[in-house]
Amino acid sequence: MFRDVLKTLPQYLIPKHGITALAGYFADVKSPRLKNFLIRNFIRKFDVDMSEALIEDPKSYDCFNDFFIRHLKPECRPLSQSDVICPVDGCISEIGKIERGQLLQAKGKYYSVQELLACDGQLAEQFVQGQFATLYLSPKDYHRVHMPIDAELVSMTYIPGALFSVQPATTRVVPKLFARNERLAIFFKTKIGPMVMVMVGATIVGAIGTSWHGDVKRAKKLERFDYSERFPDKIISQGSEMGYFKLGSTVVLLFANGEKIQWDKELLAGSKIQLGKPMAIIT
């Protein structure tokens, strides 16, 4: 724990937004020499498997960000027939029941649904006995996010905030981390009731985006986007792409009707998982 504190302490002191803006600038630079240098060294450092990428040649990407949100060959991530599939490549940070409106962040650390969604008590009440899964995407992972279940898009809320790292060491130290960082809460209707996918930003995450909106512009104020009226792409099928991170972060998945969701018993905190793998059955 002391080692985690030492790793995390500098994050309270550094200009996280400034560093993130600078990293985002360089990640969009299209200079062949610079972008090839960044991509080549990233692949080497994180042992990225380019054989899975739809475009295998690192030099074929226009900039680092294009490489980072690269598409995978469809056959590399077949979709299971499970009721609920994993929406990302990553690692399960925590998974389980929402207890009296509280989600487990790490051992001994909790945060509330209302804090996470920056919503009123009436909306948060829907999830008070729900189910949740927190999925961490490491730098080497595929960074597009897909739908875990067929759903209808209802609304989206951009919530400004801090940009702490979301690495495991930080989650064990920083209180209410996912409710403090910049994030995008996306609300859906499913056959078993409300579902929310929260895409959490972090240090050096240049942008969070969705398939219907593109990059969501960073702002100082909370912004809501309503899709309850006529919208061409409201229905999004299981496995379809719904968003992306320009540099890695975390997805928090919430289901309101907890009694309907039975998580796969093999899924525990620390488990590695890939897009399309079974996550839960609907009871």
UniProtKB/Swiss-Prot annotation:
Its EC number is 4.1.1.65. The lineage of its organism: Bacteria, Pseudomonadati, Pseudomonadota, Gammaproteobacteria, Legionellales. The keyword Lyase applies. The record marks G248, S249 as: Cleavage (non-hydrolytic). It comes from Legionella pneumophila (strain Corby). It catalyses: a 1,2-diacyl-sn-glycero-3-phospho-L-serine + H(+) = a 1,2-diacyl-sn-glycero-3-phosphoethanolamine + CO2. Heterodimer of a large membrane-associated beta subunit and a small pyruvoyl-containing alpha subunit. It is an enzyme of class 4 (lyase). This is Phosphatidylserine decarboxylase proenzyme. Its cofactor is pyruvate. Is synthesized initially as an inactive proenzyme. Formation of the active enzyme involves a self-maturation process in which the active site pyruvoyl group is generated from an internal serine residue via an autocatalytic post-translational modification. Two non-identical subunits are generated from the proenzyme in this reaction, and the pyruvate is formed at the N-terminus of the alpha chain, which is derived from the carboxyl end of the proenzyme. Pathway: Phospholipid metabolism; phosphatidylethanolamine biosynthesis; phosphatidylethanolamine from CDP-diacylglycerol: step 2/2. Transmembrane segments: none annotated. InterPro entries: PS_Dcarbxylase, PSD-B, PSD_type1_pro. Catalyzes the formation of phosphatidylethanolamine (PtdEtn) from phosphatidylserine (PtdSer).
